[in-house]
């Protein structure tokens, strides 16, 4: 899906008429904190309800300190790594708008609709969609491009987005997106 979106965005960039309504910007986000943890709230760090064996942010993991910017485990995997012109938003919270310049980036581009995908559905994806909705963006979650450790959490998060006629947005999938992109080209 990412490769198809990149191809379509390039095609739209070359056609001024389609540029306005096409896929204009691919933004990557990742949750991470400063090495000194000054941007980490104590309640998030301590997780009082977690079992004592739970690794917490900043502790050593198999790929460096967990959720610390600059550590190998914090980087985006090669298959999804941003290309030139695709910004990376480093976020200290679960949502992509909290303590970031995402809203300013989207507004500067005149973007009003967001296609949202990622992990985990019930935490980062869901929080981002709620934050976006509060700021007036229309969100479409690509369900098959999202994931969770728990299928029932994923399913519940999807139902919550579309409840009450789409209280936070709508849900689609990559097949429908790719078909729509093909149809409009």
Where are these regions (language model features)?
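A short, N-terminal amphipathic alpha-helix
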Residues: 1-25
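Active-site-adjacent betaalpha module
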Residues: 7-11, 21, 33-34, 39-185
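SDR active-site strand-loop-helix element
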Residues: 29
């Amino acid at each position: 899906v990412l490769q198809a979106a990149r191809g379509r965005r390039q095609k739209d960039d070359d056609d001024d008429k389609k540029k306005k309504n096409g896929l204009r910007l691919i933004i990557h986000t990742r949750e991470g904190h400063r090495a000194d943890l000054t941007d980490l709230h104590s309640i998030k760090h301590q997780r009082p309800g977690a079992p004592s064996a739970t690794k917490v942010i900043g502790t050593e993991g198999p790929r460096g300190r967990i959720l610390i910017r600059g550590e190998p485990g914090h980087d985006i995997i090669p298959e999804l790594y941003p290309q030139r012109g695709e910004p990376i938003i480093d976020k200290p919270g679960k949502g992509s708008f909290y303590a970031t310049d995402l809203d300013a980036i989207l507004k500067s581009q005149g973007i009003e609709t967001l296609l949202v995908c990622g992990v985990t559905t019930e935490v980062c994806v869901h929080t981002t969609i709620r934050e976006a909705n509060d700021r007036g963006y229309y969100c479409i979650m690509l369900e098959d491009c999202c994931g969770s450790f728990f299928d029932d959490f994923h399913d519940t998060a999807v139902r919550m987005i579309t409840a009450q006629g789409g209280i936070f947005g709508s849900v689609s999938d990559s097949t429908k997106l790719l078909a729509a992109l093909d149809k409009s080209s």
